């Protein structure tokens, strides 16, 4: 299964998804975070498609979408509903669309439901945990606050060991001035409790290491909204993963590369410039 949650607030739109796949016939899918797949596919700056359920059906749907001459919302909805129905409704879809207004379309149970506020698909237990983490922490209707609480609640679901079908990486697609794009961010999980007092100006961040159980990742996005892709660099381990669904549905690995080298190799191999924040010695540098 998986969990995908979409939300619209005052013209903004975001869709959060995990990357875990849980095919019981593939042992590695249960054991490795890197065996996951990108669950939210940005087709162009106006449309993204997310899925939950049967992976094979979802991959077939993505293949068929890329055969379309033009990504029009009517054709995208019709194609996904047809594939959903033909495969016994085993795979649900969530479409984020920027039309005259931001809209979320949910394809499930042989029908399409549209909302201008909220939709979700996937694991009901995961969604219930999301709601449990979201509502008690919602203190205002400020869009930035709502987005932060939403993101933190989704992180809690991924981190929980009670939801077996949800896990892996937390991928976000959101609205920017250029349309729907992947969110670039830095994630740092300390192996032990650390207290940091930051002074004004430049600060050195104690990254820790593998021995202390620290896990860090730098999420980088394509700078071209018409070539949507997302890369994740792991400073502790010096490797990167690229998700570029138009070219390859699976994760693309780059070993023994620092953040700069990872970005350079992606540009050389696929003509994509990925941007975001990377570790540069003891500092963070935007590329």
PLM regions with names:
Residues 1-287:
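N-terminal nucleophile
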